[in-house]
Regions:
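Beta-strand-rich domains and repeat architectures in extracellular enzymes and scaffolds
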Residues: 48-83
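Conserved beta-strand positions in repeat-built beta-propeller and related beta-rich domains
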Residues: 74-80, 123-127, 167-183, 232-239
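A short beta-strand motif characteristic of beta-propeller blades
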Residues: 46-55, 93-105, 140-146, 201-214, ...
C-alpha cells in the first residue's frame, strides 16, 4: 500500500531542565512560542479540512494510509484517552476509533508517535514503554516490543528492509526530573528489527546518540529519515539548547549539521 506521513515539528517552550507533575519533557512551561515570532523563514500551508474538535482526546501525532479502494485514512493517536482515531483523509470526518486503556494487545497507555508502513501501524506508547504493531484495515494487534529497553518513548521512524522493518524509537529518559548530562545521552535512540510475516518477531539491534555538545539530543521526540539519501532528522526540543533538527547519517552518527535552530 502507498503510505504518506505528514510530520509536523514545532518549537516548544521548556524550562531549564525539569518537568513536573504529569507533564512531558516538552511541556515545561505554560508559554507556547509561536513560529511567527521567530526569525526563521517559513511558509503557511492552507487547511484542507478540520477534524472534529475533541479536546478530551488530546490528539497528538498523525499518519496516513491509502486503502485498497483508494480512500485515504488519517490515523491519529489520542494520548489522553488511550486510543487511535481514524479520520477520512479527504473530509476530516471521523471513521472509527480503536483501543482503550490497558497493557493488553490492542490497548494503549499514552500513545504518542505513530508510523504506517505498508499495511502495518506502529504506535509508541509512553506509559506502557513499548511499541505496538497493528494490521490495517481492521487494526488487529499483532504484537509489541521494547519494554526491556525503553523508559519514556515518544517518536519513531520505520524503514522497510529485506529483513523486515527497521524501527528507530526516541527515548526521553530523565535523570530524576532533570535532563541527563551529555555523557548519558548515548542511548537516546533505540534500533529494532521487526518482522510480521510468519508470526511476530522483534529484536533490539542497539542504541545510538551523540554525547558531544554539538550532536547530543537533550530532549528528543520526533524522528524522520530519508532512506534514499541516508539522512536522519532528530528533533531537539530543549529550548535552552535551541529547538532544532540534528542531522545524523544512516551510520547513526551526528553529521555535523543542524537545521532551524531557534
Amino acid at each position: 500500500m502507498n503510505n504518506s506521513l505528514v510530520a509536523v515539528l514545532a518549537a516548544l517552550c521548556l524550562n531549564a531542565c525539569t518537568v513536573s507533575g504529569g507533564k512531558e519533557p516538552d511541556e515545561g512551561t505554560e508559554i507556547d512560542p509561536l513560529l511567527s515570532a521567530q526569525t526563521l523563514a517559513y511558509k503557511t500551508v492552507g487547511e484542507a479540512f478540520l477534524t472534529p474538535l475533541t479536546p478530551a482526546d488530546n490528539i497528538d501525532s498523525p499518519a496516513s494510509w491509502t486503502a485498497p479502494d483508494g480512500s485515504v485514512w488519517l490515523i491519529a493517536t489520542a494520548k489522553a484517552t488511550d486510543k487511535l482515531v481514524v479520520y477520512d483523509g479527504d473530509t476530516g470526518h471521523t471513521r472509527t476509533a480503536a483501543g482503550g486503556s490497558g497493557a493488553k494487545l490492542g490497548q494503549f497507555r499514552r500513545p504518542n508517535g505513530i508510523f504506517v508502513a505498508d499495511d502495518r501501524v506502529f504506535v509508541v506508547e509512553r506509559d506502557n514503554r513499548r511499541v505496538q504493531v497493528l494490521a490495517l484495515p481492521g487494526l488487529q494487534p499483532l504484537g509489541h516490543f521494547g519494554e526491556a529497553q525503553l523508559s519514556a518513548p515518544y517518536g519513531l521512524w520505520v524503514d522497510k528492509t529485506a529483513q523486515g522493518y527497521e524501527v528507530l524509537v526516541s527515548d526521553a529518559y530523565m535523570d530524576g526530573e532533570a535532563v541527563p548530562p551529555a555523557a548519558q545521552l548515548g542511548h537516546r535512540f533505540k534500533r529494532y528489527r521487526v518482522r510480521t510475516d510468519g508470526g511476530f518477531h522483534a529484536a533490539h539491534l542497539g542504541d545510538f546518540g551523540d554525547t558531544d555538545a554539538g550532536g547530543a539530543v537533550r530532549i528528543p521526540e520526533s524522528i524522520w529519515g530519508d532512506a534514499k539519501h541516508g539522512v536522519l532528522l532528530l528533533s531537539e526540543e530543549d529550548q535552552h539548547a535551541g529547538t532544532q533538527l540534528k542531522v545524523y547519517g544512516r551510520d547513526y552518527r551526528y553529521a555535523g549539521l543542524t537545521v532551524g535552530k531557534g
